[in-house]
Amino acid sequence: MASGRSLLTGLFVGGIIGGAAVLLTAPSSGKQLREKMKTNYDSFEETIKRLKSDGLALKDQLIKAAKESTDVIKDVGGELQTSIKKWQEEIKPHQQDLQKEIADIEEKIRQLEKTLQN
């Protein structure tokens, strides 16, 4: 926020100095000079208001985007957990079958080793 404020201050001061330098170096009557200064000031003031408005709109958009991304991340996380649980339930019978087959194979290997030792 401080850097944004310094930027605006720099723009403001630079605009005033630049505008004053241009106006004072241009050959004009006093009345024309005052009119040009007022026009330039009004233009500068409008630019500052627009910058402020754009900055606030950007801030609001960033806040909204952050909130939406947080919501999406929560939703995706919940869906992922549900998918993992469903997958685990689906593979449970296969996992049990594989464990039984592995146990059977281990038993057969033990029997073969026993037979070979005799």
Curated annotation (Swiss-Prot):
Membrane topology is: Single-pass membrane protein
Q: Which InterPro entries match?
A: Desiccation-related_membrane, RRF_sf, YtxH
- The primary location reported for this protein is membrane
Q: Where in the cell is it found?
A: Cell membrane
Which cellular component terms (GO) are annotated to the entry?
plasma membrane
For this protein, the parts annotated as crossing the membrane are: 7-27
UniProt keyword Membrane, yes or no: yes
Keyword set for this entry?
A: Cell membrane, Coiled coil, Membrane, Transmembrane, Transmembrane helix
Coiled-coil blocks: 31-118
Q: Which PANTHER family match?
A: GENERAL STRESS PROTEIN (PTHR35792), IG HYPOTHETICAL 17707 (PTHR35792:SF3)
Q: What is this protein called?
A: Uncharacterized membrane protein YhaH
Species assigned in the record? Bacillus subtilis (strain 168)
Organism classification: Bacteria, Bacillati, Bacillota, Bacilli, Bacillales
